[in-house]
Every structure is written in C-alpha cells, then in structure tokens.
Amino acid sequence: MRVSKYLLSTQKETPANAEVVSHQLMLRAGMIRRNASGLYSWLPTGLRVLRKIEAIVREEMNKAGSVEILMPMVQPADLWVETGRFEKFGPELLRFQDRHNRDFVLGPTHEEVITDIVRKEVNSYKQLPLNLYQIQTKFRDEVRPRFGVMRSREFLMKDAYSFHIDQETMDETYEAMFQAYNNILTRLGLSFRPVMADTGSIGGSMSHEFHVLANSGEDLIAYSTESDYAANIEKCEAPLPTETRQAATSEMTLVDTPNAKTIAELVEQHGIAIEKTVKTLIVKGATEEAPLVAIVIRGDHELNEVKAEKLDAVLAPFEFADEAAISDAIGAGTGSIGPVGLNMPVFVDHSVSIMSDFGAGANQDGKHYFGINWERDLPEAAAFDLRNIIEGEPSPCGKGVIALLRGIEVGHIFQLGTNYSEAMNANVLDQNGKSKTLLMGCYGVGVSRMVAAAIEQNNDDRGIIWPDAIAPFTVGILPMNMHKSHRVKDIAEQLYQDLNDAGIEVMFDDRKERPGVMFADMELIGIPHVVVIGDRNIDNGMFEYKNRRTGEKQDIPLGDIVEFLKAQHA
C-alpha cells in the first residue's frame, strides 16, 4: 500500500479525553475516530488489524467444529420476554419500537435468537451435538463508555452456542472451545491466562474467562503460586478464619468522631487497629419487606459485589443504596453507619463473625461505638464469604498462596445448562422417543476489544508494537529523499513490487515528507519490520533494516532483503 493513496490519519498530540494507552494510540495512529459516546468508526489501519484478528478467530472456530451463521443485530423483544431477560437485563438493553409499534431490542447477545432457531430446526438427538457461531456487531447501552473500544457501546464479537442432549458431549465441546480460545490468543502473540469465572447475568454452571495480561487491566486475577489454579477475584473464595472469637475485654462505648468519615480517618485519629474496625455497607434489597440490606466487612477488606449479589436478600443486579434512602432509614450518613441496632437484614463476612471488641459507626452522625461484641451488643448475624481474597492468603486449591495479576477480559465461555432451552421449550426426542430439554454452551470473544488489549500489552513511548500476526502491515519501506534521488526511487519501487509478489503486506511511504515524520509514523503505527533506503546505503550495496520490537538495526545486502524479511515474518 502506497501511503500517498492511503488514509493515514496520524496525530502528534495525545488526545485529552483518552484515558488509557490503547485509546490514545488508536486515535493517534489513525485507527479509529469517535462518532458519539462509545461509538467509533474504524479507519483503514484499525480495520486491517480488526480483520486479521477476525480471520484467526474464524479459522480456530472452524477447526474446533463450529459452523458459522449470521443472526440479526435487531431482535424481536418477544424472545427476550420468553426468557425473562427483557425486564431483568436493565438499561444496557436498548429497547425500541418499529413503525407498527412492535417491540424490538438491539442485541447485546444472541442466546434467545439462537435458541429460537435451534428449537425450530432441530428435533432429533441425531442432529446433536451442534455448535454454531457468528461474528457480529453487538450493542450495550453502557452508562459510562470508557477507554475507547475497550468499553464501547457498539462492538464486534464472536459468539458461539452449542446444543447437547447429554453432559458428556457438553463437556467435550466445552473443552474443544477452551482449547480453541487458547489457540486464538497464542496465534495472536499475546500473553494471556484462562481463569475460573462467575457466570454473571448470562447464568449457568461452569465458566472460564480469558484475560490478556496488562497492568492497565480492570480485572484482578488470583492465582496460586504452586499450582495451575487461577480465578477472577470475583470468583476466588476467601479462606475461612482459622482462629476463634476471643472473649470480650471492654465495654461498648460511644465515642465522638466528628472528623472520621472513613476507616482510614478513624484509624489515624483514634488509634484503633484497622483489623478491629468494620465497614457497614447499605445495599438495595430484593423484596418490598426488606428494601435495604446491610453488609458488614472488616475495615481492611474489600467487598466482593459478585458474592454479595448471590445473597437471596440482595437485589440483582447489585446496587448500593443512595444517600437519601440511607438517611431516611437510619438517620445518619454513610460515614457513621454500623451494625448495632440496625432495623434491616444484616449479613457479615466470615472474618467479621469472629471479631470482638471492634469499632463501627453508631448510626449517629459524627459518632462511633468502640468495644462492640457479638451477642452482648448485637445479635449474631448470618456469615458468608463476602470479600475479595488478599495476596498472600492460602489458595483455595490447597497449594501455595494467592498472587494477583491484572488482566483484560477478552473471552468468556459458559456451560449454560438448560437456563434458556427450558424457558423457550427447546426440546428434542432422545433415543427412546422421549422429549428432552437441550443443554447449552455459550462462548464469546470480544474481537474489537482484542485490538485494544493487544496494544495495552504491546507499546512503548513511540507507539504500538504489534505482534506480526495482527500488524496492519508487515514491512514498512522508508525511501530517503526519493523525490530527489532516482536511484532511491527505482530501488524502493522494485522492493515494493518484490515484496508484494512474495505475499508480504507492505506500507510504502512514498510521500514528499521529512524523514523524521516518516520514521515517527512507522513507529507510531507499529510496523514490525522497517527497511530504510538511502543513497549512502545503496553505495554500500545495503539496505538498513530495523526491528520495531527490539530496536535492533542491521545492514542487509540488496539482493538478500526479500528472503531476509520472509524469514523474519515466518
């Protein structure tokens, strides 16, 4: 591709509204442009990368025995009503009506549509197992789209769905898809980790996420230092306390704490150990009888919202109560809330259930109780695992301790069971002629998200460093002063032709531009292999080769360059 015929829309300055490196570099490299909040157009450079990832995903899906189809982005709402998700899904599901006042949704996922297709087309066990996939645009009306295509409202996704009459073939397909996802990420040249995961709003039993490892990742991965165990921190079980509750040694006293609205301030100003404090968090309840619920965790621990949402009394999706509701119910602000005397259901983390002589808000603004003890000062509360595990704690697998990594989720696979097939009466006749509800699997890959994740893992202060497999171009040709030197022009043109003939994708910078600009653009875009052509090199019978990832420079004889580049790309 000649740059003079290409839409090369690079920018020198970092856009002010781009928070993460991938968003900044995708804008600066001219890969995407924002049309509205969470909506982006893909320009030629970005689209080339996107299509390469899509091709690898498609190849691995086909190898795994999945069959490609294409379903509509616009879906009839009736199907979502059948599964109950039309109301449950929340505002992320964009609902609208056509001119005939019929209800539709813009698909964030396609379980309903695929189940509808299969229940109509498959009626015998002889047609199973069946694994179908598509690569299609999705839309989720995110309340706060962020980080460019990392969390956009419209995105490209590969979603596959498998159907089974028995658990054995379900497990076989799940394993095949697990391996396919490993193959995809390996071929993309990314460092990644598969982890056990929560099934979330889609539901089901077994689930794994695939994370590209990056310091900027939003997800925390907990893994054992001495085994293969790895899980999203949302899923990772915190260890049960090994110690027992100590006897009370002090009376409960009311203390003025006007300037202590956080645990850190309470500890600093009043000298109480943080392990002797608790945080009481008020969340929305699941019933009219208990519209608010209190969750209590130790002061140095973090609430795990996914675990908390699994409590029957807690509203799903999980949501904290607002200040007004808390004030109306308790008569105090959030900085002074505690479990003593609360007139609502109270659930505590296991670590809180063994505490004695601890401090908490007194449900009066500017006041705390110190020396609180269970049974004496407040009734025992139901205890659950409600916190995030901490680095260095024992691994749930029983081997080693937990270490933490940051990752970007790019893939998620589920065993759905009969959640959707039962709701939509997707049944087939088994070997005995009896009707049987289908088992389902669901397998998603964020194709557009992978572009951003790859950049988060592969960049430096000059720009993107693409793995060869997904680089927009494999080789860049930089001819110095080509418009003044016929020798440089002729040799550059011949090399361009030779590389094209060899099937190597080339970006040929034939602009009348300063060398510094040309070099900067090549590095920003992240072309893996760059060939510099100048009169001085030609005099020596050499090309100058530069590797984008290592920065290594080499002089390569003019007659050897094509074979050399083919070897680099192999």
Curated annotation (Swiss-Prot):
Keyword terms: Aminoacyl-tRNA synthetase, ATP-binding, Cytoplasm, Ligase, Nucleotide-binding, Protein biosynthesis
GO process terms (BP): prolyl-tRNA aminoacylation
Q: Which reaction does this enzyme catalyse, per its entry?
A: tRNA(Pro) + L-proline + ATP = L-prolyl-tRNA(Pro) + AMP + diphosphate
Q: Does the keyword Transit peptide apply?
A: no
**Entry annotated with the keyword Cell membrane:** no
EC number(s) reported in the record: 6.1.1.15
Q: Which GO terms describe its molecular function?
A: aminoacyl-tRNA deacylase activity; ATP binding; proline-tRNA ligase activity
**GO cellular component annotations, sorted alphabetically?**
cytosol
Protein location: Cytoplasm
Q: How does it assemble?
A: Homodimer.
Q: Which family does it belong to?
A: Belongs to the class-II aminoacyl-tRNA synthetase family. ProS type 1 subfamily.
- Describe its function: Catalyzes the attachment of proline to tRNA(Pro) in a two-step reaction: proline is first activated by ATP to form Pro-AMP and then transferred to the acceptor end of tRNA(Pro). As ProRS can inadvertently accommodate and process non-cognate amino acids such as alanine and cysteine, to avoid such errors it has two additional distinct editing activities against alanine. One activity is designated as 'pretransfer' editing and involves the tRNA(Pro)-independent hydrolysis of activated Ala-AMP.
- Read off the HAMAP family from this record: Pro_tRNA_synth_type1
Instruction: Copy the domain comment.
Output: Consists of three domains: the N-terminal catalytic domain, the editing domain and the C-terminal anticodon-binding domain.
The molecule here is called Proline--tRNA ligase
Species assigned in the record: Shewanella halifaxensis (strain HAW-EB4)
Taxonomic lineage of the native organism: Bacteria, Pseudomonadati, Pseudomonadota, Gammaproteobacteria, Alteromonadales
